[in-house]
Amino acid sequence: MIDRPTIFALSSGAPPAGVGVIRVSGPAAQAALEALAARVPEPRRASLARLRDAEGALLDEALVLWFPGPATATGEDLAEFHCHGGRAVIVAVERALVSLPGVRRAEPGEFTRRAFANGRIDLAEAEGLADLLSAETELQRAAALANAGGVLSRQVDLWRDRVLGLSAEVEGVLDFSDEEDSAELPESFTWNIAALAEELTEWLGRPRSERLGEGFRVVLAGPPNAGKSTLFNALVESEAAITSPIAGTTRDVIERSVAIAGVPFTFVDTAGLREVEGADPIEAIGIDRARDALARADAVLWLGAEGEGPQDAWEVAAQSDRTDFAPKSRANFTLSATTGDGVSALKDALVEAARGALPKPGEAALNARQHARLSDAAEALVSAQCLSDPLLVAEELRRARVAFDQLIGRATTEDMLDTLFGRFCIGK
């Protein structure tokens, strides 16, 4: 009897395409091969077969593969049909599959969810895979690949093993202490807890993975008609903002996300900053939004008079027909957005600054959920350092282990899993 449904989905690009790969996972995967291809090929070897429906009508000539579980991507029996990628072919093969008993279409992320449920991947790896599927820049790809490949999971396992060792040491002290005497932990025990807590604190101080999705935020600011929109267009390499010799043309915040040298950026063009009491209320709203954007900036390019911009702003001397400011004596960059002179040097400097603020290539980066769980573990270890009663210390170490288990998914809730795997596309 088949208790768990077998699922299938198109796992390659949408038709029309050169090849369409339909993946089938579950207890009826072998039966699906027998029904459509009339045979089961040798495991893990591609074999050419004619696919037919229940009435014997020819559907396609395709490569078929058979992967018996549990050593598969999902931990279940798995079959693949590599068909011609025409829309009608894919529809016909899927129609034949859905007519089989115990077989249904997969939901978004269901293949990955089964891999998680069957222990093929843990939660941190699944989150890394979700990030990898949505990665648009080289830096996003590298960070997601590190987590999907288990870099964070292996590190958490090492931390958990160290906590287990500390817990065993506490239990040993409790077991061999006299009832009359208070049990005491050796001084080295406290040092070891402190070292581990310090290591977790260092990880907690690293840039979060969400920064990669948001990108390094660069806000262009200055008074009206300072050349902000012209430089903005040059940086994003498109006519995203309207440019005009009329002061106050930009009245709202304009954002564009781009990648430079594989690093994600969000460039923000803003309304010109000036006093507008009694003036156009729409322009006043734009100026308020510009000030809000400045408060959230990672870097500010100031195109106004020298020294009048926000603290730590990059002084930019933009050479154009529309600027009439006195020359900047200490400009970080002198450029012409119209001709492009100096823009490349500015981009190079922005990339260097962004690399220091974003997760490093190939380094595992924590998302908000992982950061919260690691923070729980660090908090438990810091608390354990301050305690002298071994029983209380043992409880704090248990709390740290639970936090590690939650981080990699040994203890999870269905709602959280639904949210995660709902991010995946159908067929993954």
Where are these regions (language model features)?
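C-terminal-of-GTPase-core extension/linker across diverse P-loop GTPases
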Residues: 1-14, 127, 136-259, 265-267, ...
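A glycine-rich (often HGG/GG-containing) alpha/beta subdomain
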Residues: 1-142, 146, 150
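Residues immediately flanking
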Residues: 24-26, 85, 270, 306, ...
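A secondary-structure boundary/capping signal
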Residues: 25, 93, 222, 269-270
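Switch I (G2) and immediately adjacent beta-strands of P-loop GTPase domains
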Residues: 48-68, 248-278, 299
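Switch II of P-loop NTPase G domains
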Residues: 66, 79, 271-302, 306-309
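Short, solvent-exposed loop/helix junctions and linker helices
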Residues: 87, 120, 284-287, 340, ...
